[in-house]
């Protein structure tokens, strides 16, 4: 499988070279930054601008924490967090991704305009989500694997074959989308790394080592989001998420070396610099 373009709203994102998705968290309980960018829209917008300057190709904006044990956030609160930021960045002329699992939030954002990608940790399982996206002509979609819900997904997760189970799940979700009329070139897949998505350390390592097989089995490009997650903390011994930059960059490079086309990261400059050197040296990890 060698697909070189991701149809994402107003953009055709080339996948011949790895792309960086910069994370803009608007959640006060974010595991990675403690909610520092959720204080007000201007703080979040300044952060988004900085990510673009540092080399982000895509901005991913989200208003609901999906960390392990995250508390419930109402749709009204989620929309109140993301709407003022989405309204502003929609006119920036860069690919904008909305990180949400709720159909009602997707619908409001798409009506607002300027939203190119729906990045859904629940793989469009919310009622009406597939049908809503099927009615859109070009909106890009990222379908992610998650076991359970954010509040409970790390309570005794079980897999017999994590790579096979993730592949089968994502194949089934993408097949449902295509059957509903969503063009395959609009779809990209995310295996869902981290304890926050129902996978302990050994399962995350297995998934990372078998990314080529996962991509071959599903037939779609991959987006990898492992930045600052507990997996990195467990491997490095770093309890503070903000101090997991070096491990996160290493994981991003390993992802790209194994075929991932997009990496979703908090630390854009460090990742962009590492990718520049890696590409220039032609390293095959």
Swiss-Prot record:
* Protein source organism: Neisseria meningitidis serogroup B (strain ATCC BAA-335 / MC58)
Which UniProt keywords are listed? Folate biosynthesis, Magnesium, Metal-binding, Transferase
Q: What is the effect of changing residue 220 to Y?
A: In strain: 3976 / Serogroup B / Serotype NT
What's the catalysed reaction? (7,8-dihydropterin-6-yl)methyl diphosphate + 4-aminobenzoate = 7,8-dihydropteroate + diphosphate
Its cellular-component GO annotations read: cytosol
Task: Specify the effect of residue 206 to T.
Answer: In strain: 3976 / Serogroup B / Serotype NT
Q: What is the effect of changing residue 188 to T?
A: In strain: BT490 / Serogroup B / Serotype 15, 952 / Serogroup B / Serotype NT and 3976 / Serogroup B / Serotype NT
State the name under which the record lists this protein: Dihydropteroate synthase
| Consequence of changing residue 174 to A | In strain: BT490 / Serogroup B / Serotype 15 and 3976 / Serogroup B / Serotype NT
Q: Name one GO molecular function term.
A: dihydropteroate synthase activity
Task: Give the protein's cofactors.
Answer: Mg(2+)
Q: Which family does it belong to?
A: Belongs to the DHPS family.
| Top EC category | transferase
**Is Endoplasmic reticulum a UniProt keyword of this protein?**
no
The consequence of residue 42 to R is: In strain: 3976 / Serogroup B / Serotype NT
For Mg(2+), which residues are the binding ones?
Answer: 25
Result, substituting residue 172 to T: In strain: 952 / Serogroup B / Serotype NT
The record's annotation in PROSITE patterns points to: DHPS_1, PTERIN_BINDING
Q: What does this protein do?
A: Catalyzes the condensation of para-aminobenzoate (pABA) with 6-hydroxymethyl-7,8-dihydropterin diphosphate (DHPt-PP) to form 7,8-dihydropteroate (H2Pte), the immediate precursor of folate derivatives.
Indicate the impact reported for residue 105 to V: In strain: 952 / Serogroup B / Serotype NT and 3976 / Serogroup B / Serotype NT
Q: Taking every annotated instance into account, which residue ranges of this chain make up the domain Pterin-binding?
A: 18-276
